[in-house]
Amino acid sequence: MKLILQEKVANLGNIGDQVVVKPGYARNFLLPLGKAVPATPEHIAEFEKRRAELEKAAAELLAKAKARAKKLEDKTFKITANASDEGRLFGSIGPREIAQAITEAGIEIEKREVDLSQGPIRQVGEYEVPLRLHTDVSVNVKIEVAPENSNS
């Protein structure tokens, strides 16, 4: 299926690129999320009129992501969790908890931007966690997992 990309899509193309993708990828991902439109003559003409404003919006998103990445550089965020004496967590720390800790520190992060491809954190310690703020911007932050002080 031939499409025109409305925004940059990782491993596919940039704004305005005409790409050929499998119909399922187009139907289930690109079209419903507004990342692309079918490459009909009408859409091609309409896109050429709107190209400048779409590119400007994409540049603004990139600038915002770079600004957030600058704020996040060399930062350590502490998360406390209930843990055993050996340092194993009761439960785990996933993208939601990491995003919440960073947001509470004053930098807005969504859980979909946290890349825990190695799986959730299950031990006390320091971890380097990558954040994907934009298709072109990623930054690593340190997450320090500490046991909760329990005096039982």
Swiss-Prot record:
Signal peptide: none annotated. Keywords: Ribonucleoprotein, Ribosomal protein, RNA-binding, rRNA-binding. GO terms for cellular component: ribonucleoprotein complex; ribosome. GO terms for molecular function: rRNA binding; structural constituent of ribosome. GO terms for biological process: translation. Gene3D superfamilies: Ribosomal protein L9, C-terminal domain, Ribosomal protein L9, N-terminal domain. Binds to the 23S rRNA. HAMAP family: Ribosomal_bL9. NCBIfam families: L9. Belongs to the bacterial ribosomal protein bL9 family. This is Large ribosomal subunit protein bL9.
